[in-house]
Swiss-Prot record:
The gene is udk. SUPFAM superfamilies: P-loop containing nucleoside triphosphate hydrolases. It is found in: Cytoplasm. CDD domains: UMPK (cd02023). Belongs to the uridine kinase family. NCBIfam families: PRK05480.1 (NF004018), udk (TIGR00235). This is Uridine kinase. It comes from Bacillus mycoides (strain KBAB4). ATP binds at G13, G14, S15, G16, S17, G18, K19, T20. Pfam families: PRK. GO terms for molecular function: ATP binding; cytidine kinase activity; uridine kinase activity. GO terms for cellular component: cytoplasm. Coiled coil: none annotated. Its EC number is 2.7.1.48.
Amino acid sequence: MGTNKPVVIGIAGGSGSGKTSVTKAIFDHFKGHSILILEQDYYYKDQSHLPMEERLKTNYDHPLAFDNDLLIDHLQQLLAYEQVEKPIYDYTLHTRSEKIIPVEPKDVIILEGILILEDPRLCELMDIKVFVDTDADLRILRRMQRDIEERGRTMDSVIDQYVNVVRPMHNQFIEPSKKFADIIIPEGGQNHVAIDIMVTKIATILEQKVNL
């Protein structure tokens, strides 16, 4: 375990942009090192106090849907090399699960989420801020596949949500947050050149911290 503060890489972008692919590529490159992934998706607000009809109205693409206070608290604890208990979100019940995931601190933290660059408090904790930029048509196709296969949604509900929620929220909150990125990666996880540049930059930062 390092004696210095861990390196935090923030990876943002629209739903279906390829954030997970970029995150996995970086994680796989450094998997022999001390590295972890912290997903903003796990930090949706607990809604157990609300009836199901109210939970179903949740706008998961709005900044207020996230419990960023808890996410920031956990990130600060990990930066202090303290263990945290990451929440699990149940998308079928539309609320936080009673289960948790213990997360041990690591020297490299990849923070991934659609709106992590929208919150200045999170940006302040990042060493590298990345925005994965992908064509809207490709993003909706990826989101449809994920929500149908992994979250039990119907195609009609996914399309309706995209038109009425996802697209306007992307234009209002996610796209504007791109200006806070240090690096913008077009073509998502297929852009191997950009990923290689990121890997080199991360390795340089890690080496500098070791030599401090």
